[in-house]
Amino acid sequence: MTQHVTAARPAAIRTRPGWRVWNLAALTALTAYSTGVAWQAQFVSYPLYRAMSAAEFPGYHLAYNAAIPGVVIIPGFLSFLACAAFPFARPAGASRTAAVVVAVTGIGSLLSTVLWAIPMHDRLDAIGQDPATIASLLGANAVRTACLTLATLALSWCTVRLIGRGQVSS
């Protein structure tokens, strides 16, 4: 009787999701959110920079920058950094290749933001509306959007595979 109970326990433990599975689920949701924000910026927010008058642009850009920390900056940087660390936190059933893809896209998103997009925003603050700077900002965001999209696809694929294997049931 004792052996039967002991033998049944490991099977029950194996089917219970651990922190790595919950981390995957949370990272997938966070990265999907950041991906949506990036697509919105690419096709709505940043193109509207061109539609403003030069006189109205500085005030608008300052207001935009003040409005985005909680909905864009914090989730974005959390996503970039968590993606970069994903190979160290991936669940056992998640592909190593997918984990590397997620990490590379996290690093790519971080670098395109810090080394390219932020300097373009700073330049817009300094010189005002400038078509070349807006075009460069769109380029930086295109890289970030592509990286985030690829990360979301890879994370979603990992999640679907784990669900298909029954490794996410509680």
Predicted segments — roles?
Residues 2-7, 163-170:
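Short, charged juxtamembrane terminal tails flanking transmembrane helices
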Residues 3-13, 17-74, 119-136:
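Interfacial loop at the N-terminal end of multi-pass membrane proteins
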Residues 17-32, 85, 89-107:
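Interfacial segments of alpha-helical transmembrane regions
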Residues 38-42, 84-94, 114-121, 156-166:
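Transmembrane helix-loop junctions and nearby membrane-interface residues
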Residues 75-85, 145-153:
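Core segments of transmembrane alpha-helices
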Residues 107-115:
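Mid-bilayer segments of alpha-helical transmembrane spans in multi-pass integral membrane proteins
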Residues 128-157:
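Alpha-helical transmembrane segments of multi-pass integral membrane proteins
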